[in-house]
């Protein structure tokens, strides 16, 4: 009697390929809807604003922004925002550049602005009276600038207003308290407190001021007596603490590399860190609305469910990009830096490097979210001899709330390969793509890496690949370079011969 196993063995002997392990099924993309949906990209007179702060006022649905300029936006319909006033620049004594601002706060029709100062601009407190309509267009405002306050030795950062008092972070000088003369609009200092560290962010609730310090702390200050403020307590947040938002007894701090930090300040004399959540980039500013914390984190804007303060839960993120006119064909759009954020319920307002955006939050949705390193925009394999290879590992991560499928990874040039061609990552999981360059000539070679995934916000990501690239590049010698320094001396690259050299870009804003 012939057994079934004998038949199977005979068939396999005749057709070996038919009995080999079946090929794995190809990975197919899932179908997801993003928790954050774009409503509007607001293009005004200027398309490169470098927005620092945006703040939303619920009483009239105005959105205020500080950037290269100051502006007021009608945000009653977040999908159809419009400028009420824009491109306003401050006239500052002794400064011909007419700067914008970095921080803002309001007191009715008076909106205060501050600038910390830099190599090109002096520091100041000023602002705008927005009570007047434009006679040529009654739908728009015609703001008038407030008098400028400049105090010897001071530098001004975050600002907030409560009960007619204006509270300003003075960096290494602590916190300053001011009052405005209603007739002249001139600010005068009424009190101050030092010894707080390098202060940056300010929010006031009743008679308590919450202040962040760049050393990584949140401080509480009693201002019941404005002339004699008193330090109440301090919580160590870690990182570089900048922006903050306060709701009831809870404070939310954007703490740089520490990400989002949640502080319980129910005991003002002993505030305590109760929760943290990492951010992809440097957390700069934060807002709070209806159980959610919204974080401007340099590389993206992020939303967390903070209904359980000890365990902030990531909901979603938005990475905004802009096209840059690179000379190379195939370069990916660059990440547009995000420094400002504001929220009203499910309406999210993002202050991007270029222009403001509005998004609608759908907190009930789950979706994958692909994170790639910024250097993917220019992956330089350095000099490689003809016929030789060089492999670079690229970290990929799914920061989303459901599995991420990279269902098609490929390159446009035979000189470059990527493996694996498909990859699946669970929520929160990281993996690697191996990029290999095989030099086919001694000349420069270029290609584009394509990553197709089921991330609903960025289903197609690309990277620019170069090998044997001309000019300054990874692994290539630095040509003789001379630099005139600000102190009048000179620096030459020969001074750092055979040493690793960091080339840094610096600009003043």
Placement of each model-derived feature along the sequence:
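Beta-sheet-dominated interaction scaffolds and their linkers
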Residues: 364-399, 438, 442, 469, ...
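N-terminal "domain-start" segment that seeds a small globular fold
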Residues: 466-494
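Short acidic/proline- and small/hydrophobic-mixed sequence motifs that coincide with surface turns
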Residues: 390, 401-406, 444-445, 491
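Feature marking well-ordered beta-strand scaffolds used for ligand recognition
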Residues: 22-365
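Surface-exposed binding patches on compact interaction domains or structured appendages
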Residues: 367-377, 399-434
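Short active-site neighborhood of thiol/selenol oxidoreductases, capturing the structured segment around
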Residues: 493-509
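C-terminal motif of bacterial Sec signal peptides marking the signal peptidase cleavage site
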Residues: 17-18
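Terminal connector regions
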Residues: 442-470
